[in-house]
């Protein structure tokens, strides 16, 4: 629900499409090539920056050396994907095609729209899931791993581990200390704006809360809505809660609250909503009836000056407008936690289901997805994220991406996002989604009673 | 479910025929008859009644839906005790009641009123009927979309006509929780009125004509004729329409689900049940307890309906 | 109903005399305004569906400068052509045929049993038909996850996520209404027909096929029209029981198309009109059947 493209289309990839005759032939050729070289894509040795994929099926993969698990793999695997919007869907297809070209393993992609995929993840994983599937790091990954619904891929990690930072490894590790997840990319939640608008009006980037509000006042005087806002889907408002809580109360308190170690009735939480009230005069009205896509359009269309959202908002911009988008981190609030630079930067990635029909093929796919090469292919078509692997080629990053990498790298406290950091039933439509909408609808309500309701709901779940 | 089916009971004055039993049946014939009855009964009971009973049983349990039945934990009445403090529960009940109130007090009477008007011999009655009835053939999901085009904040028809599309005076029809349920009810009534109109019109057509003429000759006004003569005669149909109105109010789901998945002021019991099973974390037991509440409310009108419909069954 | 309508075709002099011209004009004025009000939302959707996005964005309520079919081609493309319509057909046509056949069978058979049994069965079916679907969905969902299905019918080998499963729940739910209507109808058939057939030595099955079924053509036609519309319009069952987006019938799939369409209301309008089209066509072509289906219970005798 965090996630990007929440309300969006089902566009299912017909299984047959990815198995067009052309790819089959290419795949066969690739298998031959691989057999000849004996090399297999696996993890790359750390730091190595492979040449960006040149597209040829016969390109030998960087090899971590050693055995060749793929030689026995072959065949085909299935892949449940939630990349259903046009841009990421095509990007994912390019990754899959490159994998097939490389290994000869056919991938049948089952694309389900983002929202439905998440809603049905539990029954999907218990029923007859695809061999591999897209998912998110954090509590949400650990929950399903803990229920035995995912395959332990620690052996894959032992090969690819050096290609990731410790933070990524930790985010991929279940409660039992084993790894279940391959990080693919992440993206920060930041304040996005159009450079041309800021230049035209002579606005400067606000660093502190007061600067931020002063800028908002100027924008209002200029007839702009300072901050675009849309929360009809329930989750975008969580980003605002997260950032205010981390900046006011610190990362540790935020994560503790998500895990249930802190209470919602704590006055610290009330202070978050009090701060939120200060933002209200600057926020776009009618947020509860507006999707994030429409809110992004308001910022891109220059009716609104700024928009606090994940960088995926960039997907809403046309090709021509995209270079004009820029962003800055949420301003500091003048607390002891300012130096943490806490931020939401959710990680998206992949898992292997509990009993894949083709385990070797699935692991092979995981190894491929853990390469900078695969991540570069994806980011080429969808430059609104940054790659997770160390060996990803960052030289091709747009300035937008370089800045994302900088902000994430500069943060000392990275959270995943409210609905990835806490229990799904607590974060869901009848829980936090509804509670935050309730606050937006009536921000002046009595906070004591409001927060007590939230705490009671938490208590009823555990 | 798009519409509650409406088998109207026998029209007043229909004749029934005494039934005879036959004994011309061979053993094979009896077997065939048993199969003809058995298969549909099996399907219906298996997929409708067994789940209904299971809903009741599961409502005493706690289960996140993962693993087999052995993972079910029995918690007695705990789910029910938690219902009143479950934040969306009271709003959902209130909204279902609002839905019922609007249907009963506005939509259904309007449908009846239109049926009475259309029952006169007037020119173009077919056009009027078709226009009013048109929304009924649309799915409730499509009805939701069509009305979103009316209610959308910046691009919707209504706000543009009212001139309320600007920051400061924007009317957020579907987002403001003081407004959105009423906005949805307009859309739902748009469909319900036509449905009731059609059913009632059929009922009116079956009223013995001489009754009205007699009243008319006695000097009764049209209104008097309707309320004193026609309406009482149509009692069976009135009851059916009442029941349909209640059941439709309890079934309400599709429109709010396509608008915002039943959040933020559009909570309904049916949505709460659904959200507890589709979602990342299933709360099977708790969701079932809400389903049981829905069941208990439905039982009353269903019994009234059965009583009515079956009384008219020829013996 | 038809008989009554015919009877009423000649209005009596008394009623005609009592009506003056003015109220009649008022009545028409009222009915015309209500009709326009009723048609407006749909007409607006149709109008929007022909306008280009840029024009609507600039001036949502305005006379058109250009009208285009682009929204339709675009919507059709994004809905991947007939895919979802095909899913609907695969579910609805067999479900409709089976439910009518089964309902005919049981309606015929119960008329051979004791009255008490007959009534009990009818009550069970009708009550089931009236339940809100959400009352049964939670256990049904688990049952569907547990019931096996040959791989021919569903590659996942379960009722869950299969066309078959969706068709079955439609059948189970709609059986009540169809049985009720058909059993009422059959009671109006002359008993002598069945008796004569049986006396002639025809088996029950033959009597059913060759005597009863042909006689039931009128209610079957009406029920088929109605069932098509209801099953086509169903949103809920597939939403819960069919997780694979590509297999969903068109009405449920629409929900997933919404996100894509949301910022582009013209596209949303075109998508809605496209999806509403089959039911509108059925309605206009078979209006009489449609209305008869809904009111069948009252027409017997």
PLM region spans:
Chain A
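Mature extracytoplasmic/periplasmic domains
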Residues: 150, 155, 301, 312-316, ...
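Glycine-centered hinge/linker elements that transmit conformational signals in sensory
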Residues: 218, 258-288
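Extracytoplasmic/periplasmic substrate-recognition and gating elements
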Residues: 97-102, 200-201, 274, 281-284, ...
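Extracytoplasmic "Venus flytrap"/periplasmic binding protein-like
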Residues: 98-165, 196-207, 298, 305-306, ...
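Hinge/lid segment of periplasmic solute-binding proteins
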Residues: 136-189, 213, 240-242, 326-328, ...
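N-terminal secretory signal peptides
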Residues: 1-20, 30-43
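Extracytoplasmic/periplasmic solute-binding protein
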Residues: 63, 180-184, 189, 213-261, ...
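C-terminal capping/gating helix-and-loop segments adjacent to ligand/active sites or protein-protein/ligand interfaces
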Residues: 174, 257, 384-390, 403-459
